[in-house]
Each structure stands twice: as structure tokens, then as C-alpha cells.
């Protein structure tokens, strides 16, 4: 039994279609270089992994608490580093079960990468079940992590369309409140025309946040970046941002929180207008 993580680049196929060959090669080169460098500086003792194109498979030696903590730490740090260095958003999943990477005889012109095991299949299938940039967890991995307690602040149980999902976030509210990080995030979202993944990522970053000032600030900053500080000139960007927030695949609780911000912003604007008239 092992823990297996499967990660890949959000929207890679769409990106590839817009790139020339040398741009795609540079993109993948930057992705793999950052992953390798982060791997080297981590204190890894119980993990192995390999990269194929835009995908990264990481697996543990066993299912000990140490192995689980290590794979979660490494996955989280790699995801954050890829975003910080390359503006690459990763999504993925972690599952638990049988897994084996088979050693096979190779020749110089034909290399083999043979893997087998239910844990890999589960992680691969889980990866796309939640439209977000977080890491989806199998139920047993979530339970193991909750028992350890180390990452409980970033673990969430979310019911989406009457089905329970377990998510590990790597983009926190404090991380996104850093101007450079949020600017990169909005740029990617604008390029993707604000797919549900981006709203749901914001939702998980806000989840369980008790500081209302921070919540208000992240929405305020988002609007400012979406319209590039010129709302009257770039109103179409704002319209798209608001309209797409209510797509079917955006988590309902995000829509509720977003509407609360809009109401609050309108009320504040009316109060300011009343004060001016007085």
C-alpha cells in the first residue's frame, strides 16, 4: 500500500493550442525545472516521483504517517512554487492503495514507463472531479490526514451536487492577498475567460476565514485587477467576471459569499453618496 499523487497543469491543452513549438518546449522546461529544484530542496526520505509532459506522479514507500505528511508537504510546496515562479496552476489528487512502478529492460530508442495499481487509477480519476486548483483527496486519505491533524486548516469536506468531496487547498487567502500572486492569478483567469475553477479556488481560499476585512479586501482587489483599475473603461471585463461567477459549476457557497460582497459594496457606495449630499 502506498500514497499516490497525480498532478497536472490546469488548462494545458488549451495553452498548447495557442503556443508555437518553441514556446511549448520552454513552458514544459520551466515546469519541470521548477519541480526538480523544489524536489531537491525538500527533505525527502519516503517518496519517489517522475514527470511526463505536464503531469507529475509522486508516490510513497508506505502508508505511514511520516509518508503521508511528506507527500502532502511536497505536493503543496511544488504547487505553490510552480505558481510563484511560472504562473502555472496545478490541480491534482492523492489516493491510497496498491501501486508499483515496474522496472523494464529498455533500448536507446525505446524507453518504458510502466506503472500499475489502483491508487494511481483512483488519483487520476479523482483529479478532475472538483473544478478547482486544489488537491482532491480520496476518503481514506482525508481520514488519515484528519487523524494526524497537521494540515487540518487546509482540509475541507465539501458537498457539491449532493456528493461529498475532500479537498486540500494550497492557495490560501493570505497567499492570494499578496499583490503579485493575485495579479498572476487574475491574469490566468482572464486568459481562460473565468472558468469555474478560478472562482472555486477563491472559494476554498476563503473557506473558514473569520476575518471579514480580509474577505472584503480580496473581492475588492479582484475587481480592481479585473478592470485594471479603470472600471468605466474596462466594464466588459467586470461584466464577464460577475456573469461567470454564477455558472452552474461554480460552488453555490461561493455565489452566496460573492453576492454578500456586492450588496455590501452597494450599501457602502450609497452611504458615501448620502454623506456627500448632506
Regions found by a protein language model. Give the residues of each.
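Short catalytic/ligand-binding loop motif for oxyanion handling, primarily in non-cytosolic enzymes
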Residues: 14, 100-103, 143-147
Amino acid at each position: 500500500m502506498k500514497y499516490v499523487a497525480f498532478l497536472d497543469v490546469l488548462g494545458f491543452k488549451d495553452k498548447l493550442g495557442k503556443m508555437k513549438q518553441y514556446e511549448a518546449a520552454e513552458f514544459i522546461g520551466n515546469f519541470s525545472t521548477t519541480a526538480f529544484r523544489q524536489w531537491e530542496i525538500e527533505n525527502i526520505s519516503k517518496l519517489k516521483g517522475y514527470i511526463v509532459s505536464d503531469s507529475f506522479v509522486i508516490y510513497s514507500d508506505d502508508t505511514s504517517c511520516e509518508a503521508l505528511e511528506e507527500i502532502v508537504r511536497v505536493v503543496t510546496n511544488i504547487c505553490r512554487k510552480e505558481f510563484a515562479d511560472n504562473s502555472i496552476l496545478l490541480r491534482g489528487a492523492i489516493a491510497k492503495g496498491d501501486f508499483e512502478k515496474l522496472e523494464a529492460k529498455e533500448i536507446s530508442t525505446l524507453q518504458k514507463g510502466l506503472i500499475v495499481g489502483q491508487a494511481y487509477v483512483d488519483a487520476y480519476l479523482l483529479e478532475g472531479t472538483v473544478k478547482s486548483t486544489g488537491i482532491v483527496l480520496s476518503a481514506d486519505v482525508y481520514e488519515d490526514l484528519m487523524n494526524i491533524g497537521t494540515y487540518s486548516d487546509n482540509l475541507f469536506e465539501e458537498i457539491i451536487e449532493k456528493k461529498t468531496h475532500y479537498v486540500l487547498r494550497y492557495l490560501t487567502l493570505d497567499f492570494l492577498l499578496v499583490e503579485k500572486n493575485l495579479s498572476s492569478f487574475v491574469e490566468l483567469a482572464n486568459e481562460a475567460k473565468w472558468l469555474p475553477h478560478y472562482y472555486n479556488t477563491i472559494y476554498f481560499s476563503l473557506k473558514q476565514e473569520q476575518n471579514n476585512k480580509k474577505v472584503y479586501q480580496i473581492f475588492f482587489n479582484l475587481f480592481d485587477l479585473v478592470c485594471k483599475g479603470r472600471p468605466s473603461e474596462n466594464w466588459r471585463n467586470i461584466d464577464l467576471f460577475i456573469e461567470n461567477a454564477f455558472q452552474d459549476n461554480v460552488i453555490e457557497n461561493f455565489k452566496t459569499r460573492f453576492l454578500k460582497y456586492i450588496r455590501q459594496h452597494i450599501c457602502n457606495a450609497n452611504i458615501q453618496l448620502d454623506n456627500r449630499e448632506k
